[in-house]
Amino acid sequence: MAEGARQAPAPPQTDRPARLDLNELIHQPVRLSIMATLAHAERVDFAFLREHLEVGDSNLSRHLTALEEAGYVLIDKVFERKRARTWLSLTPIGQQAFRAHVAALQRLVAVR
C-alpha cells in the first residue's frame, strides 16, 4: 500500500458487542449527518449541505476537514462562472466506513 494511502475499516465482527464496531469519528451527530447526506448523492454543494444540516460555515468546515483527513470525504474546490464552489463526495473508503457504521447501529438496536 502506498504511503499515506487509507485502508478501509475492517468488517464488523458479529461475535462481539455491536458498540465496539461503531466508528467514533462518524458517530458524532454532525459528521453522521454529513456522511448520511453524502451517501445518497454523487456529490453535494457545500452551501446546500450547510443549509440542509442547519450549521454554520466554520462548524461544517471543521467536521469536513476531520472526515477528509480520515480519507472519507473528497473536497473539490472549483471555479464555475468566475465563482468559487466547493463540491463534496464520499470516497470509496468513506462509503465502506459509513455502511459498516450503519450495520453496527442496526445490530445495536436490533431486538434480541
What are these model-predicted stretches?
Residues L64-A70:
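Basic amphipathic alpha-helical segments that dock to polyanions
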